[in-house]
Amino acid sequence: MVRRLRGDCMEEVERAKAVLKENNVRQVLCAFADVRGYLQMFSIPAREFVDGSAFENGIGFDGSSVRGFRTIEKSDMVWMPDASSLKIIPWIDDPIQKSAIMFGNVYEAWGTEIADCDPRGYVAKRYEDMLKSEGMSAIFGPEIEFFLFEGVDFTRLSWDMWVSPNGGAGDSWGPPRIMPISSELESGYMIRPKEGYFRPPPEDTTVEYRNELVYYLEQLGIDIEYHHHEVATAGQVELDFKPKQLVDVGDAFYLYKFAAKNIAAMHGLYATFMPKPLYLDNASGMHTHQSLWKGEPFSGEAVFADPDDEYMLSQKARYYIGGLLEHAKALTALCAPTVNSYKRLVPGFEAPIYICWSPRNRSALVRVPMYVKKPSAIRVEYRGVDPSCNPYLAITAQLAAGLDGIKKKIDPGDPLLEDVYELTPAQKRELGVGELPTTLRDAIDHLASDELMQEVLGSHIFDAFMELKIDEWNQYCLYITPWEFMKYFDI
């Protein structure tokens, strides 16, 4: 008998069938994520869900063709639909192309048990269910940043003979690099590097795109709280949506990226979630706000809130922060999982590289926002995340680290109220402020020695992730960059 983790009640299935029929949907895009965090998708005619047995039996596929899933001799797997996640794709009007998207969990052969390679069903859903069994819940609000480019040519390099990355110290040239195309770099109303934050049009060339993206995201059930141009030039933007629980926030992340890329393509543009595409400008992050609740979010008790505390923080919130700091180095492998991620985690670009916590202070890895002084608004923000991550893994790992802090009563120490970037190395040592890993290789080494993270991922995903990331690092180490030719050719 087929077991489903989510959306298996007849009411949800019948609702989904009605939505498909009422909207004359022709195709359903069946979605899931691989271990790396890449969205995977295949199409099934809607009639297979409305009149056929796709909801009951799922859809079989080749798991050996998905990175990190199965080897060829064990390749038969079953995608089981989550009827509650069905959404009509709102920008498709052509009746021939009319489509919906639905997430699902991945099962082993015959559809009898959840596959331990599935980030959504095996990792995120498992932890969400664990919280519910204890009468608890958690919500997460990621601040997803990305760039909107007009074009990019991977075969063309730009360079500047007289530009110094060190303000005149050391080398006096800017290395050859790929330079994306953006009118924000070329027009009379150009935005200079690091001067894009909250810029209005006409300097901000992305506002009409953002307005359109908000329109479609809200039809997909993603309520946007606010959006704006970000710090970097060349079309860096941020759109923040209201917080969601663990599985739903992962689904929303993928819907967000799917919509952002498709709306961009409709206008001949390119949306990229690559963390650091621009040299000497800010990178894209995904600061993740989170809070714990007894019962349901907002209607239950806010676990992190204590009205009598100076920062409105309960002792459990402090222990939660302690857990995040304790596991920060291992978390970095999951939260910043690409070689490019570590071009973001450097001083001088508003990135959190120091392991400490603080209220209001954006130089700390963990920040306690101080906007609204009421229990339901009290939360912690983990800033060491970027949008190249797999949210089902990265956000679940943050939750697990925080819960481990509560379980073990890990004291985070006093908050650091100074600008950490301005402290001397001696001052940081005296205060016990550590640093995040500086390369992907360092991060995966820390992940390898963290037993909690191994428990969160399970042995299969842990081993697959390690293998994929070690291979990625080795590929990078073999590549000879244009910078090396500029630096060393005349030795």
Swiss-Prot record:
Reactions listed under catalytic activity: L-glutamate + NH4(+) + ATP = L-glutamine + ADP + phosphate + H(+)
Positions bound to Mg(2+) 2: 145, 230, 238
Reported temperature dependence: Optimum temperature is 83 degrees Celsius.
Keyword Metal-binding annotated: yes
UniProt subcellular location: Cytoplasm
Positions with a binding annotation for L-glutamate: 282-283, 344, 350, 362, 383
Domain GS catalytic, chain residue ranges per copy: 119-491
Family that this chain belongs to: Belongs to the glutamine synthetase family.
Name of this protein: Glutamine synthetase
Native organism: Archaeoglobus fulgidus (strain ATCC 49558 / DSM 4304 / JCM 9628 / NBRC 100126 / VC-16)
Gene (name only): glnA
